[in-house]
Amino acid sequence: MCSSDLQVIVVRQAGGTIVAMINSCPHRGNRVCHADFGHADSFVCSYHGWAFNRDGSLAGVHEEQAFRSDPNWRPESVGLARVAQVDTYKGLIFATFDADAPPLRDYLGDFCWYLDVMLDADEAGTEFLPGVLSSVLECNWKIAAENFVGDALHAGWTHDSGARAIFGGPVKELAGGESYHASVDGHSWEFNLDEIGNAATLADRRILDYLRSRREVVEARLGPLRARMVGAISSVGVFPNFSFLPGQQTFRTWAPLGPTRTRLTTWVLVNRSAPPEVKEAYRKGVMLTFSPAGIFEMDDGENWEQSTLVNRGWVTRHQRLHYGLGLDTRIDHDELPGIVHRGQVNEANQRLFYARWTELMRGPQP
């Protein structure tokens, strides 16, 4: 698994626990795992033959006798370096190198209530479909991440031609109606309650029929409000850099490769119990819309790259950008956790995303 320029190996152990390690031999730093996924009992460095068990401990070395004769040789101290914390939530694996970071459930907090719309709408749980999409965008990672935390505004303009190609008409008006921005410590969800708006963009009747057939089951599991969010027009960002689109089921991470380059990795997340034909419809739908050659992703990528390109100059980097839409829209809501603003066409979540980023960037230095 690659996150920015750092590669890690994530391995499920025999007892079911999960270990994450740096994909770098502690002898000369060479890569020890070359596969993106699969099964392995050990990892062997091609440079000097150091071998490691699935838990990262040293299994053996080439010319072992030479090392054994060294009085300073401590094989137990030269395993693959561990990631400090690894935890899971509803099948997703989270990890951090910060040993002092809060536990995962504390980090996600009340945002778990929202995440369950995507991760816990079915008793059988979720799974990723086989395959992964990877591409590099010439943009800063934050411009892409902020788009997913709350930018419903761009859809009717940026994606107009794509919508006309799929639906024969423009993106429907999103202003007004029952819609919200919700944010918890930088984690954000913008949505309305139209039930199937996002899912409809995948242009496959089987997906819509599947969602409608499950409405009562989901409502019994999550309640009536969240049941209306499952396929609705919405976008989500878990701070700082992974995003998904409920209904469209695209799940992605934005890994910075520098201030002006980002690696985008995309998966398709579905209910494990969904019929095979529905899973295939989701797979093809994501390829149609949110893949490197997808109708909507090409639109977004062009905007993000141009926004990054023209702001490399000293003068443009110092201009003040307008993030003022919806300043007076904060409300109290009996059911929705976090900081809630009325109206999906808003910039509240973007402001809260950057406020959280600024808070962390200005925090105490180690």
PLM feature spans:
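Short, small-residue-biased leader/transition segments that mark boundaries at the very start
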Residues: 1-3
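Short beta-strand micro-motifs enriched in acidic
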Residues: 11-13, 35, 255-257
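Short solvent-exposed loop/turn micro-motifs enriched in small/polar/acidic residues
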Residues: 43-44, 77-80, 236, 247
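Short Fe-S-cluster ligation motifs
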Residues: 53-93
